[in-house]
Regions:
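Nuclease catalytic cores that cleave nucleic-acid phosphodiester bonds
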Residues: 66-189, 201-203, 207, 240, ...
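Domain-level signal for Mg2+-assisted phosphodiester chemistry and nucleotide/NA-binding surfaces
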Residues: 1-103, 143, 147-151, 263, ...
Length: 281
């Protein structure tokens, strides 16, 4: 088995919190995000979170103000720098008020300026406006990884050196029924998320692939490799969600959440399968 040596890479993490929260990642665990970004024991040189803050609302709503400040404090305890983008209020011709707080420009400028000292950048966003930022970072010699959940720009996926769905990262987002007493991700009886990489249309069964640990070897997808961080689970089509079209399988774009049951042969069995992404139409 390969021995993982300490990396000398310097990493920057930049989180577009509004985009992530609006698109499936509202309960994202920032400590796990940091661990994922530094999965090869790299040094986290920059950890930036861009948050919106409604100062006008905070003046009249103590609950909002206290929760927002407590959330920011929790992020700082994890080593993140919190960059606050204040909501600006406007009024249209009909007299309706609306707020704006776009942190895209701030985040883009920061990552470009700070990339001089970085080897790798992780952008937590699905916003296609960052495509040019990705290209600029790559031209400066940085490896660029992106992570998001729903409504991800296809162009952003393609331009990134690696795109990872946040749904697949162990522990990054709580699973259904996740609590203190639940088995840990990857253990028998636990809930995990993965995708179907093989499907037999004639015999009506397939195999799910899922991550069991954070690892620098994400490219080793063959679970037979002892260094691979992936495992597989067998499933029968009858266990898939009602209404799901099996002709779409295999697919890396359809992410399922399922329970790992006792092995039927070599692989565990995926049961109680839910479609997490995209939503079942």
């Amino acid at each position: 088995m390969t021995v993982i040596l300490k990396s000398h890479a310097k990493v920057g993490v930049y989180v577009d919190a509004a985009n992530i929260s609006r698109n499936g990642g509202q309960r994202m665990q920032y400590d796990v995000l940091r661990e994922f970004a530094c999965r090869d024991h790299a040094e986290p040189l920059r950890l930036n979170v861009y948050l919106t803050y409604d100062e006008e609302r905070a003046e009249t709503n103590a609950v909002y103000r206290d929760k927002a400040r407590a959330y920011q404090s929790a992020l700082r305890e994890l080593g993140y720098k919190v960059i606050e983008k204040r909501v600006k209020w406007f009024q249209d011709e009909a007299g309706n008020r609306y707020g704006k707080a776009n942190a895209d420009l701030d985040m883009a400028v920061d990552v470009l300026l700070q990339s001089e000292n970085l080897d790798r950048v992780l952008l937590a966003t699905g916003d296609g406006d960052f495509v040019q930022v990705v290209r600029a970072l790559q031209n400066k010699g940085c490896r660029v990884e992106t992570l998001a959940f729903d409504n991800v720009s296809e162009e952003l996926r393609r331009e990134s050196d690696m795109f990872v769905s946040g749904y697949l990262v162990p522990g990054l987002l709580p699973t259904r029924g996740d609590d203190y007493f639940a088995p840990g991700w990857g253990a028998m009886g636990s809930r995990v998320r993965g995708y179907c990489y093989h499907h037999d249309d004639n015999k009506s069964f397939g195999f799910m692939r899922f991550l069991v640990k954070l690892s620098p070897y994400l490219w080793k997808t063959d679970s037979r490799d002892p260094d691979s961080p992936y495992r597989t689970a067998f499933f029968h089509d009858s266990s898939l969600p009602d209404g799901f079209n099996v002709m779409k399988l295999p697919s890396r774009n359809h992410i399922f959440e399922f329970t790992l049951a006792e092995p039927n042969g070599k692989q565990p069995v995926a049961t109680d399968i839910l479609l997490v992404h995209p939503a079942l139409s």
